[in-house]
Amino acid sequence: MTLNGGGSGAGGSRGGGQERERRRGSTPWGPAPPLHRRSMPVDERDLQAALTPGALTAAAAGTGTQGPRLDWPEDSEDSLSSGGSDSDESVYKVLLLGAPGVGKSALARIFGGVEDGPEAEAAGHTYDRSIVVDGEEASLMVYDIWEQDGGRWLPGHCMAMGDAYVIVYSVTDKGSFEKASELRVQLRRARQTDDVPIILVGNKSDLVRSREVSVDEGRACAVVFDCKFIETSAALHHNVQALFEGVVRQIRLRRDSKEANARRQAGTRRRESLGKKAKRFLGRIVARNSRKMAFRAKSKSCHDLSVL
């Protein structure tokens, strides 16, 4: 299961209390109209509220400001209208986890459309936007709060509140890769009965000469821990869009009916060549007769975020 990214920042405080900035983005990547941004206090009470049905809207309330933003694909829209509101059922909560300095904040800022200026230097933000994936709109709320100083309660709540998890490591740092493996084990313990999407992300793939973790190592780790895998470069914006669209697909595959998922995948299958279909079919037959081949087949599919 494979995907491909950037950098992190440090958090700040406002008005004597620790706060998280919530930013909303829309439209294509690149210079565009102002981005709506909200201040959200980050404390134990807020994250506890996010765990209860219907409480995410209350936790998201804050003062509206404006800031710069980048473009998302042309089919992406801003679903937050003046006077409108989000609901827990329509918003997918995505948690970014990983060691310091691997690029979690850079990936989040690209998603949120904020990369330049002093605001881009702060970590501990929440970004939300609506994107269209496979012809259907979805709202994502991306939490970049893993490294905030919230005491012992913060990691536990982060691992309990997500609809999907993105575990980021740097391909230039073997230690961050090992940390990512540890986080996957912790998630399995925290969400034993939940079938939540987990995507392993090897960021900074553009730093070829400094690479310490190969693509094969990342893919093998994803297969062993039963999660998807992708390499990104936040610096080059490589695979960042594919990452977040893949998150939406993985959530839908687990939540939606078989009929709805089959309808979405029909368009993709129509575009697939006959040769690819035959190759995939033969691969499945061979995999049934060999554990080693089955492992290889699974490792090849771990990069495909449109399938389970």
UniProtKB/Swiss-Prot annotation:
SUPFAM superfamilies: P-loop containing nucleoside triphosphate hydrolases (SSF52540). Belongs to the small GTPase superfamily. RGK family. This is GTP-binding protein RAD. Most abundantly expressed in the heart. Also found in the skeletal muscle and lung. Lesser amounts in placenta and kidney. Also detected in adipose tissue. Overexpressed in muscle of type II diabetic humans. Residues 278-297 are annotated as: Calmodulin-binding. The modification Phosphoserine is found at S26. One of its GO terms (cellular component) is plasma membrane. May regulate basal voltage-dependent L-type Ca(2+) currents and be required for beta-adrenergic augmentation of Ca(2+) influx in cardiomyocytes, thereby regulating increases in heart rate and contractile force. May play an important role in cardiac antiarrhythmia via the strong suppression of voltage-gated L-type Ca(2+) currents. Regulates voltage-dependent L-type calcium channel subunit alpha-1C trafficking to the cell membrane. Inhibits cardiac hypertrophy through the calmodulin-dependent kinase II (CaMKII) pathway. Inhibits phosphorylation and activation of CAMK2D. It is found in: Cell membrane. Its main location: membrane. Residues 1-16 have a biased composition (Gly residues). The keyword Membrane applies. It comes from Homo sapiens (Human). GO terms for biological process: small GTPase-mediated signal transduction. SMART domains: RAB, RAS. Induction: Down-regulated in failing hearts. Residues 48-68 have a biased composition (Low complexity). InterPro entries: P-loop_NTPase, RGK, RGK_GTP-binding_reg, Small_GTP-bd, Small_GTPase. The keyword Cell membrane applies. Residues 1-88 are annotated as: Disordered. Interacts with calmodulin preferentially in the inactive, GDP-bound form. Binds CAMKII which is capable of phosphorylating RAD in vitro. Interacts with CAMK2D. Interacts with CACNB2; interaction may be involved in beta-adrenergic regulation of heart rate and contractile force. Interaction with CACNB2 regulates the trafficking of CACNA1C to the cell membrane. The modification Omega-N-methylarginine is found at R24. GTP binds at G98, A99, P100, G101, V102, G103, K104, S105, N203, K204, S205, D206.
